[in-house]
Amino acid sequence: MDADALSATPAAQAALEALRAAAGADGPMERHCLRQFAIAERLAGDRAFDRELLLCACWLHDAGLYIPSRDPYVTEGARLAARVLEPFGWPPGRLQRCMDACEQHHAPRSRMAMGLEVELVRQADLVDVTAGIVSFGLDRRWLRALFRDVPRDRFWRLVGGAVLGELRHRPASLTGVFFSPRRTRV
């Protein structure tokens, strides 16, 4: 899978560039987002979804980790999505769905009511972070092949560093990440 080839629209290219500006190119975060998108597409099955929105949300969902703030990093990710994507003239409802996908990706319960893409980002993130232990019915052979094709090396170091950074710099925000994510509006 090639991140640049996948990002065929100007909005997707801008989202990928925003991720790379924050986290670096072809690092563990970019590969996590790439795997997450592949997993989300697979989870969608034959259901119709907004592919560009899903890809942009996957690129931007964790980028808030790199933004200094007292607010939850998922909220910063939603704000970044708005800043990156507003210039492309997305209708407010579409932009809101992308922001929700970023902000709600650690929600403890389904976010299907906010849109299929929001729930796909949430489920796909959980599949990748758990290395397929949580699979939402995906074929484990397919997941193993994905993890070979888009390597997971240095991913756990990234996750550990992110958790420690959040605990050190904005510990009070963690409940807003995992238990009661807010909803930032367009």
Predicted regions and their residues:
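Generic hydrophobic secondary-structure packing signal
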Residues: A11, M29-H32, Q36, L53, ...
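His-Asp-centered metal-binding catalytic motifs of divalent-metal-dependent phosphohydrolases/nucleases
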Residues: R51-S69, Y73, G77, C98-H106
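An active-site-proximal "capping" alpha-helix that borders the catalytic cofactor pocket
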Residues: Q36-A40, P72-F88
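Short gly/ser-rich anion-binding loops that grip negatively charged ligand groups
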Residues: D26, I67, D71, F88
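Divalent metal-dependent phosphate-bond-processing catalytic cores, especially two-metal-ion Mg2+/Mn2+ enzymes
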Residues: D2-S7, R20-A48, L60, W90, ...
